[in-house]
A protein has these predicted regions:
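C-terminal transmembrane bundle of multi-pass solute transporters/carriers
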Residues: 54, 71, 80, 85, ...
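Transmembrane alpha-helix termini and helix-breaking/packing motifs in multi-pass membrane transporters
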Residues: 28-35, 87-92, 148-168, 253-254, ...
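A single, central transmembrane helix in multi-pass transporters
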Residues: 162-167, 206, 210-275
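Substrate-agnostic recognition of the 12-TM MFS/MFS-like secondary transporter fold
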Residues: 7-24, 45-61, 67-82, 99-158, ...
Length: 420
């Protein structure tokens, strides 16, 4: 795909995602070691989602009002400076729980503002016929980075600790910002309301009003899109915590394996995203929204495989291998379904609404992260066997597949039949 702007976004995403993957992995281990409790660990992660909830409405309005290149560049420079300052604090040995929490809180704000700008810019720089492949490529290259990141982070964390990882992340944000300065993204079409001051109470009030308007719009005009967004929330409650809460507990605490092994396990899990992104990029016509529920079948198989580990006793490394393969199947499902549904949303929602709808989607998905993390953290701390937890997870996710089939796949089929 010969497209300068798309190439820059892809390279910029590789660089910044590389830093993010390393930081996410290392901070998970850092917090788990620091707190010593799965419940407290999950609570801290849940609190870090609060900025997403608060700033998601503003991010959509911002993305539909300001040039999306400027949003990406300014935020990456800011993150580079913030993490650079945090690296300086770490090197001086002045770190504390308050500082860690503050840095995570501010970074969460930046991620919230950044996401809709990237998502909304893709349809501006890529032709509609190449949109599915473009989203697949972005998903794929990001996934490759996410495979290498945890493995390298596990080695760095085990050998050198958190300090080196934070420095690497600061550099990655700086390089990403420099790359994005060469983007050429046109301004979005503006109405009279978009000329108001961005930093004002009116802007903030209208941003939250836009969130409500997005919901009303989707409920009336795009019910399938609303159902897709609801499925994202369901995944974040009953699926994602397996990788964010259960995985570090199972590998590092229950099996007592080193951080390097956890890095490899997470890398194998993310390999599923590479396979999914590669598959849908080269064979986009194999997948359609009429059968989107099929993409969730590997996820059911993966969680079922993981649940077996709660009832067998074999070599710890063999158990970690089985867990990793189950995670690979989960990520394969998420990769295929996310690219397919994201492309569908981009085609269905008008450009002047896309940023706000993307922000609404992020808000709903993010609000659902905290309950999932808290739920899994608490049930693990209560001493409920991991096998039982995962069997219940399988049941809930079978319900998700049924929901997707009835509310998304069948609805798309009915709409196409009416249009024919």
């Amino acid at each position: 795909m010969r497209n300068k702007n798309f190439l820059i976004i892809v390279i910029g995403q590789i660089i910044s995602l590389f830093g993010n993957a390393i930081q996410r992995f290392s901070m998970s281990l850092y917090l788990l070691e620091f707190t010593g409790s799965t419940a407290v660990f999950s609570q801290i992660l849940a609190i870090s989602t609060i900025p997403y909830i608060i700033f998601a409405p503003i991010s959509g309005k911002l993305s539909d009002s300001v040039n999306r290149k400027k949003i990406m560049v300014y935020l990456d420079f800011f993150c580079a400076a913030l993490i650079g300052i945090y690296a300086f604090i770490l090197l001086r040995g002045n770190d504390s729980a308050l500082i860690v929490g503050t840095v995570m809180f501010i970074l969460s704000i930046c991620y919230t503002l950044y996401g809709p700008a990237v998502t909304s810019s893709i349809p501006q720089i890529v032709d509609e016929e190449n949109l599915t492949s473009a989203n697949g490529i972005i998903n794929q290259v990001g996934s490759i980075v996410n495979v290498v990141g945890p493995i390298l982070a596990g080695i760095l964390y085990g050998l050198l600790g958190i300090k080196v990882i934070v420095i690497i992340n600061a550099v990655s944000f700086l390089l990403s910002a420099i790359m994005e300065m060469f983007l050429d993204i046109p301004d979005v079409a503006k109405n009279d309301e978009s000329t108001e001051k961005l930093v004002s109470m009116d802007f903030i009030k209208k941003s939250f009003g836009d969130m409500k308007d997005s919901f009303v719009y989707l409920k009336k005009e795009k019910k399938v899109v609303l159902a897709i967004i609801a499925s994202y929330a369901f995944c974040n409650i009953f699926l994602v915590p397996i990788l964010s809460i259960v995985a570090p507990y199972f590998i590092n605490v229950l099996l007592e394996l080193p951080s390097e092994i956890y890095g490899i396990v997470e890398g194998v899990c993310v390999l599923g995203m590479i396979l999914g992104g590669f598959w849908i990029s080269i064979k986009p016509k194999m997948f359609s929204m009429k059968k989107v529920h099929y993409t969730y079948y590997p996820m059911i198989a993966g969680v079922t495989l993981m649940s077996i580990l709660g009832f067998i006793k074999i070599n710890n490394y063999a158990m970690a291998t089985i867990f990793a393969f189950g995670g690979l199947l989960i990520m394969l499902s998420l990769s295929l379904s996310n690219v397919l549904t994201l492309t569908f949303i981009q085609k269905q929602v008008p450009s002047n609404m896309l940023g706000r709808v993307s922000a609404f989607s992020v808000a709903v998905a993010t609000i659902s992260v905290a309950p999932g993390q808290l739920l899994y953290g608490q049930v693990i701390d209560m001493g409920i066997p991991l096998g039982i937890i995962l069997i219940v997870t399988v049941i809930f996710n079978i319900g998700l597949v049924v929901f997707i089939k009835k509310r998304v796949s069948d609805t798309v089929v009915e709409s196409e039949e009416k249009a024919a």
